[in-house]
Amino acid sequence: MSKVSVDTSQPSPYIESDSRLHMIKRKLTYAFAIKMIKKYADVRNFNSLLEIGTGSGFFMLSCKGEFPKVSLSGIEYDERLLSITRKRAPFANCIQGNAENFDLHPNKYDVIVSFQVIEHLYNPEAMLSQVESHLNTGGIFIVTTPNLDGMGAKIMKEKWHGYREDHVSLKGAKEWEDLITNNGFEVKFSGSTFFTGIPLMNKLPLGLINWFFLVFFGAFRWKKGESFVGVFKKK
């Protein structure tokens, strides 16, 4: 049986604020993913998108604003987060499901995204198999996950915030890249973010540097940042 590390008997640490400032922050966070979709997807024939792990639904809002004609769907394991997403993004078809064994066939998608989800899975290869199965040939898969090879992990060691009880599949950027390409994908972009895993870099004035790179670059083609960011194309 498929197993995930989310404990729904405890308060969810992933319920996000409705404040205007937080919504702006989230929009900036997802701007890079929107940019990658526009760059690598066949936007003239871009009709459907699936998000694995909708969280609180902020990415769905960003997509609706950028791609108003695209059919949006989502899967969320935690019913509490799913309820929030359905209220925040009623235009999207979001269901409860497990990233390792969902079955939405005969539906297929032009773009599938998953942000900070795969590290919660005991069997990430199962999710990659589902992504490959549900993605149209030539479709784009965008994934982010904590980077075990990042400077934050190396400097903070056991205090690194990526080390959590529910992060059961942590890997370095190169290891993630190899795993995904071995499951039927080719690399379009492979890199990582900046230094958000180092507390000092999140405080003023250094925090402004982090925000500058987030807003204007999103991610870089290097392997030492906080989160791995990968854009892959189904062969």
Regions found by a protein language model. Name each.
Residues 1-107, 111, 115, 125-128, ...:
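Conserved N-terminal segment of class I S-adenosyl-L-methionine
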Residues 6-32, 36, 100, 122-131, ...:
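S-adenosyl-L-methionine-dependent methyltransferase catalytic module, highlighting the catalytic core
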